[in-house]
């Protein structure tokens, strides 16, 4: 179990810690690490995009582009991970996506890119969290959205 003591001082969460926090696994774990964590307030998720990912075989065969819905999922996983970190990583908790608002896709994300997902907490009420998310490649905004999620006890 990851302690929440000193979470504001935690600078990064590596893949091993992510695997202990999130239930997602290959091919659906869409973040490689989280950096610049400021408690539950904000963090940056990192996803290294490679041609070996299964969605590139069909999206699109001659010009591979990361599907926008997977960028949204990477945003949700980053937000969910920081929310769970601040609960002390209780394995009985899961984060379910509730809404996606104002999603915009500005530029394609392709193999070789490093996606940086900037997540900021907007609102916290009970088990609900609302986040502002901005995805960037080389400091250029490629996608953005507001997401809401609910933390629930796993049955």
Curated annotation (Swiss-Prot):
Alphabetically ordered keywords of this record: Cytoplasm, Lipid A biosynthesis, Lipid biosynthesis, Lipid metabolism, Lyase
One GO cellular component term noted in the UniProt record for this chain: cytoplasm
E.C. code: 4.2.1.59
A single GO molecular function term of this UniProt record: (3R)-hydroxyacyl-[acyl-carrier-protein] dehydratase activity
Keyword Lipid biosynthesis: yes
A Gene Ontology biological process term: lipid A biosynthetic process
Location relative to the cell: Cytoplasm
Record-annotated active site: 59
Intrachain disulfide bonds: none
Family: Belongs to the thioester dehydratase family. FabZ subfamily.
Xref: NCBIfam families: fabZ, PRK00006.1
Designated name of the protein: 3-hydroxyacyl-[acyl-carrier-protein] dehydratase FabZ
Name of encoding gene: fabZ
């Amino acid at each position: 179990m990851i302690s929440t003591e000193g979470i504001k001082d935690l600078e990064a969460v590596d893949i091993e810690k992510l695997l202990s926090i999130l239930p997602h696994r290959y091919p659906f774990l869409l973040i490689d690490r989280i950096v610049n964590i400021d408690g539950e307030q904000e963090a940056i998720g990192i996803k290294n995009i490679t041609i070996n990912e299964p969605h590139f075989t069909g999206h699109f065969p001659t010009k591979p582009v990361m599907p926008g819905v997977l960028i949204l999922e990477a945003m949700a996983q980053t937000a969910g991970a920081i929310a769970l970190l601040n609960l002390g990583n209780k394995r009985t908790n899961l984060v379910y996506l509730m809404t996606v608002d104002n999603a915009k896709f500005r530029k394609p994300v392709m193999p070789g890119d490093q996606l940086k997902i900037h997540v900021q907490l907007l609102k916290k009420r009970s088990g609900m969290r609302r986040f502002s998310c901005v995805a960037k490649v080389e400091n250029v905004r490629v996608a953005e959205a507001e997401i809401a999620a609910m933390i629930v006890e796993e049955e």
